[in-house]
């Protein structure tokens, strides 16, 4: 009997609660963060129309100019920004070059001429205030190396392999890592005199400074024969990547005079090296 009265006494309370409005959810304060990318030092022609902003692994494709994000106040944020670069993928602020499409002896050989990569990283440990701003200084992360050989015979095609090349770079620190073979196709052009010029182009994230940087060039000649050129470029690459300008190296020896290797390389428009 007591149990029955207790049950009946609950009915009015349940009915009354069902008519009450639920409380509004608590909303955390927000900060409007304005992000600006600083392209100082980057040639106008190299500046892309769009790039990627990554905030705590949330990725946005944005255009140049100021971009505003509504973020939770009093939170920490890891922010990276980088350009789209062919044959380069970026995960957890690590940029990595894809594997070579040309089959060589090393199964882990990388593409020696990926797209040009610019990027940067910043961190906000405690975002405060109704509004805030952050400027991201974009840095050039790839560097060009061009090796040229004078050509007095006809070449149909070719490719080259450079040892001791970095396969990745950390956007947080700017430090490159890895030591792989990089593979690139040879470029054959005709100059104003009607002569062929052979250029071996590389675009690299960096070099393994402890490795020997041997360049091997494989050429298919028009007469059906082939030629392999092996040379050590280590001494010429000791300061590679310290400036944004390309490093251009040329040989003063004609192709027909090269038996197996080249010793008298000259650095062109990038400093002076005594040979």
For each feature predicted by the language model, list its residue ranges:
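Beta-strand secondary-structure signal
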Residues: 32-36, 78-80, 133-135, 144-148, ...
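Tryptophan-paired
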Residues: 47-96, 157-238
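Bacterial Sec-dependent N-terminal signal peptides
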Residues: 5-41, 266-268
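Structural motif
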Residues: 34-48, 148-155
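Conserved "repeat-terminator" motif of extracellular CCP/Sushi domains
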Residues: 26-28, 135-142
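Structured interaction patches on ligand/partner-binding surfaces of diverse proteins
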Residues: 87-133, 223-256
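Short, surface-exposed binding/anchoring microloops in extracellular/periplasmic proteins
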Residues: 139-161, 165
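Short, low-complexity, Pro/Ser/Thr/Gly-rich segments in the mature regions of secreted, periplasmic
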Residues: 185-189, 201-202, 260-275
């Amino acid at each position: 009997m007591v149990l029955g009265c207790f049950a009946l006494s609950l009915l009015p309370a349940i009915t009354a609660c069902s008519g009450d409005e639920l409380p509004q959810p608590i909303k955390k304060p927000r900060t409007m963060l304005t992000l600006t990318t600083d392209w100082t030092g980057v040639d106008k022609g190299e500046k892309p129309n769009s790039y990627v902003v990554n905030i705590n692994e949330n990725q946005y494709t944005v255009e140049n100019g100021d971009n505003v994000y509504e973020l939770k106040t009093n939170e920490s944020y890891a922010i990276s920004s980088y350009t789209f670069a062919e044959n380069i993928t970026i995960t957890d602020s690590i940029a990595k070059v894809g594997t070579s499409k040309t089959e060589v002896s090393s199964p882990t050989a990388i593409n020696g001429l990926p797209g040009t990569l610019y990027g940067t990283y910043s961190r906000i440990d405690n975002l405060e205030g109704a509004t805030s701003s952050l400027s991201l200084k974009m840095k050039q992360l790839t560097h060009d190396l061009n090796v040229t050989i004078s050509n007095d015979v006809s070449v149909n095609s070719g490719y080259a392999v450079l040892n001791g090349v970095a396969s990745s770079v950390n956007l947080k620190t700017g430090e490159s890592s890895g030591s792989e073979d990089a593979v690139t196709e040879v470029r054959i052009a005709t100059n104003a005199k009607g002569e062929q010029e052979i250029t071996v182009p590389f675009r690299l994230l960096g070099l393994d400074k402890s490795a020997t940087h041997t360049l091997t060039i494989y050429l298919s000649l028009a007469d059906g024969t082939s030629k392999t050129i092996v040379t050590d470029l280590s001494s010429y690459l000791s300061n590679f990547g310290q400036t944004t300008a390309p490093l251009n190296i040329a040989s003063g020896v004609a192709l027909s005079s090269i038996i197996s290797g080249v010793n008298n390389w000259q650095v062109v428009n990038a400093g002076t090296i005594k040979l």
